[in-house]
Structures are given as C-alpha cells and as structure tokens.
Amino acid sequence: DTPASKNNAQLYCTGTVNCEFERWNQIKIVNADNHRVSREAIREKVVRLKRDDLNEANALFLSVPAGQHELVIRFYPVSVDRAETLHVIHRFKPAERYTFRMFRARSRHQGSLLNMSAPDPLCVDLKQNQRTIRRFCKPYNVLNGLGEFVEQKL
C-alpha cells in the first residue's frame, strides 16, 4: 500500500465456489476464459492478494479509489463452468470495506407445482463493513430458466 491507496475502498466477493472481478470501470480484471488477472489490472494496481495461495477460491480483492464506479463480478454458485454475472454502479466511500456476498434466498413457495419446483432466487448482498446496504436478486424464470439481477428494497 502507498499513502495514496490508504484511502481506497476495498472490494471483496464471497459466498460461492468461486467469484471473480471481471471489470472495474473500463479496466478488465480477470479473464473469463483462462481465469487470469490482466496485465492492465496489475499495472493499475487495483488487484490485491488476500491469501498466500492464489489457488484458493476468492483469493483476490480490489483496492480502488473512492467515488462512483461500475463493477462487474462473476459468481460461480455451483461450479466453475457456469457463471452468474452481476453489474453494479455504486459510490464507494474512502477507506471502507465492501463485500459482495452471493446466497440463495430461501422462500416459502406458494402457488402452482411448477412455481414450487423452481429453485430459490440467487441474491447478492452488498455489505459496507458489516452492514447490508444493497441487495440484488435474480428470480428463476420457470419458462426459460433465465433471469436478471434486480435490486430489492431492504
């Protein structure tokens, strides 16, 4: 860390087999095909290593200047073969820790057997330090299996 980066926001992702930061603003971070960190991300000094072992899941985090930024995160809830992608624009505050945590929202199903058989929605909480400040959920569409992450009221 440098004196300038002490005020950076730290961004983490967790909750799944693996998660990767795909892009921060225009800077590509981790390649989706080979799962390698881009030279640009290293040159811009936004990538940090959380643990000693790069082979551990979720070993990377970002250290970024405060302000409004676009972030794209790939979560792998079941396996590393299938990613769920979240696009977020957020105003990050200086020297704060932000964690994007994916989970499956357990719900009491009501209605038809078809609706009841659908998997529970995938959700991502954005936590600032320990407090959840935003939530995005991706309901399962019974007809085509596809859905988009939509911000929920907290």
Question: What is each PLM-predicted segment?
Answer:
Residues D1-A66, R74-L154:
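Short loop/turn and low-complexity linker motifs enriched in small/turn-promoting residues
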